[in-house]
Amino acid sequence: MARHSFFCVDGHTCGNPVRLVAGGGPNLNGSTMMEKRAHFLAEYDWIRTGLMFEPRGHDMMSGSILYPPTRPDCDVAVLFIETSGCLPMCGHGTIGTVTMAIEQGLVTPKTPGKLNLDTPAGLVAIEYEQDGQYVERVRLTNVPAFLYAEGLEVECPDLGPIKVDVAYGGNFYAIVEPQENYTDMDDYSALQLIAWSPVLRQRLNEKYKFQHPELPDINRLSHILWTGKPEHPQAHARNAVFYGDKAIDRSPCGTGTSARMAQLAAKGKLKPGDEFIHESIIGSLFHGRVERAAEVAGRPAIVPSIAGWARMTGYNTIFIDDRDPFAHGFSVA
């Protein structure tokens, strides 16, 4: 029998949790972070489920594990873990991870105020603002984002037939905008969105193929982004992003905001240099910006950036003990 210990720094980004594993993570094989991600999923996924699910976590829990970079142009590598699996990229997770890693001295940037992250989705460039010991703001320049498909038809429980656009911003998102059978996220409860989203996701994945043209391992739709009119006076739009099995992102969602900007840019509603302020279901804001035009395997794309803040909430030494019948976690349907 064995007891495995994990030293974690807990915090949140604009309201959504981030658990940074600062000690206890496994050594992983692979020459890239995508290969290391595959090794983790094949051999160590019990760490993810044990730390993310109940009784040590909860339905909204997400986190990260730090590793030495696999490429010379990066300061540190990050593996993202959450209840839904190991995401190739996580925007709110990046902002929280960078904030806590800098404040706790877990990462020493080569250039103060700047950091390059090695993620499974690719290089993510970071700029951060620090006041004394505290990081007040983080801006990440994400991987290229693009509109993948428009007007995909799918049957949604209770609502009936709806159409969605699918965009990539580090993960694939189905974007639900106002239409005949859907008005605004505010017209439905969070419980309704949580009930409909996994069915919608399953039906879309069964009916359509979602394949990143350059990254073979990114081959399914993972998130649903429900849109709405903003309530905050600075915001351009509001969203409720569904992920995992029953979670609504409390932050505006970084990769979701990237996907949304890519969708709007593809339709001529955003251009390089434009800002896009995205509001979450709890009213927190991410400040997005279209940095420049790009291309992914011949497909028009943008390079988006996202700025937000995070706060540390405490330290946590977590045991995963083989004697515990719930060592690897559980989720109640």
Swiss-Prot record:
Catalyses which reaction(s): trans-4-hydroxy-L-proline = cis-4-hydroxy-D-proline
EC number: 5.1.1.8
Keyword Secreted: no
Active site as annotated: 90, 253
Molecular-function GO term, any one: 4-hydroxyproline epimerase activity
Keywords: Isomerase
Enzyme class, spelled out: isomerase
Residues that bind substrate: 91-92, 249, 254-255
Known partners and oligomeric status: Homodimer.
General function of this protein: Allows intracellular utilization of 4-hydroxyproline, one of the major constituents of host collagen, by converting 4-hydroxy-L-proline to 4-hydroxy-D-proline, which can be further metabolized by intracellular 4-hydroxy-D-proline oxidases. Strong B-cell mitogen. Plays an important role in the regulation of intra- and extracellular amino acid pools, allowing the bacterium to profit from host precursors and enzymatic pathways.
NCBIfam families reported in the protein's UniProt record: PRK13971.1
Family from the record: Belongs to the proline racemase family.
Name recorded for this polypeptide: 4-hydroxyproline epimerase
Native organism: Brucella suis (strain ATCC 23445 / NCTC 10510)
